[in-house]
Amino acid sequence: MSHRRSTVKGSLSFANPTVRAWLFQILAVVAVVGIVGWLFHNTVTNLNNRGITSGFAFLDRGAGFGIVQHLIDYQQGDTYGRVFIVGLLNTLLVSALCIVFASVLGFFIGLARLSDNWLLRKLSTIYIEIFRNIPPLLQIFFWYFAVLRNLPGPRQAVSAFDLAFLSNRGLYIPSPQLGDGFIAFILAVVMAIVLSVGLFRFNKTYQIKTGQLRRTWPIAAVLIIGLPLLAQWLFGAALHWDVPALRGFNFRGGMVLIPELAALTLALSVYTSAFIAEIIRAGIQAVPYGQHEAARSLGLPNPVTLRQVIIPQALRVIIPPLTSQYLNIVKNSSLAAAIGYPDMVSLFAGTVLNQTGQAIETIAMTMSVYLIISLTISLLMNIYNRRIAIVER
């Protein structure tokens, strides 16, 4: 009986590792809760002392300032909530453009690093070593102040067949206007794609069963080109083009690619493509050389070997670090505030914060946007990575 009591007493003593672990965890939780409570109380007290009301009611108030680029309709008197949407769309736009351009450029630069051509290999190496070792902010300044801002003014703009004009105020290009046959055109395009994909799959199945290869692309080309043209002939033009024209000291009509967007896209695309190129090179070199020899022994030409044998296997190595580069693009897009591009940081965490004083709300919303975008990219890339992963039986 006494032995049982001493055992229970010993198990509840501080010398017991389990007791110490639980005690330390409880103390840590109490400390964290206390710090959070102190921060909350301190924040509320400071806001009350300064007469700042918390909450998101400010989103319904009028902004009172213009925005040079907006993908949706925006007027100077629109609300701060609409400013938030404009900044979000501008951030998504520059992130998407940079991801596409950096991926394409990095892919070809990475292939050039493995080329048998000495000059091409050295030029790609120089490209990578230069652009990945210069801070992205300096590259943004270079493209914006040293290149784009030194272009001629609107009256001396560089013209391309009087359809597009390049000046220090941006690139003006014709903008599409929806016509009467737009819906019919879209339906025709979708139908052509569906029929072409079905035809490719049917011919692939036929080739597997019989060993005979049927040429699919001529019929697919006729479908993709012919059906939309037929829809336009029957229902009218799908699009009309608004061509920019010089009016006074600037161009009117069309759409404009502002210098800030161009500089940001160029800088981040070039900067990130240098890292992606090294990822592509490492991924290709990670594929066993026996795969190259096996494809060569089957008589496959180098482009086919690369496209159908090497790249599919290299993707398993490429995708994880490539995801990190895509996330870096989204986060580096916040540098747009340095040259005045109206993204989330410049518009919402900058102008809106200064006008409303709602620092906690604006910063929290801005941080949440970047967090959600990053998590979405990670989720999509992880799903794709699992689809291409080798499944062991």
From Swiss-Prot:
Keyword Transmembrane attributed: yes
Transmembrane segments: 21-41, 92-112, 128-148, 180-200, 219-239, 256-276, 333-353, 363-383
Physiological role: Probably part of the binding-protein-dependent transport system YdhWXYZ for an amino acid; probably responsible for the translocation of the substrate across the membrane.
Residue span, ABC transmembrane type-1 domain: 88-381
Main location: membrane
Lineage of producing organism: Bacteria, Pseudomonadati, Pseudomonadota, Gammaproteobacteria, Enterobacterales
GO cellular component: ATP-binding cassette (ABC) transporter complex, substrate-binding subunit-containing; membrane; plasma membrane
UniProt xrefs under CDD domains: TM_PBP2
Keywords: Amino-acid transport, Cell inner membrane, Cell membrane, Membrane, Transmembrane, Transmembrane helix, Transport
Sequence similarity: Belongs to the binding-protein-dependent transport system permease family. HisMQ subfamily.
MF-aspect GO terms: transmembrane transporter activity
A single GO BP: peptide transport
Gene3D superfamilies xrefs: MetI-like
Protein name: Putative amino-acid ABC transporter permease protein YhdX
Keyword Cell membrane (UniProt): yes
Subcellular location: Cell inner membrane
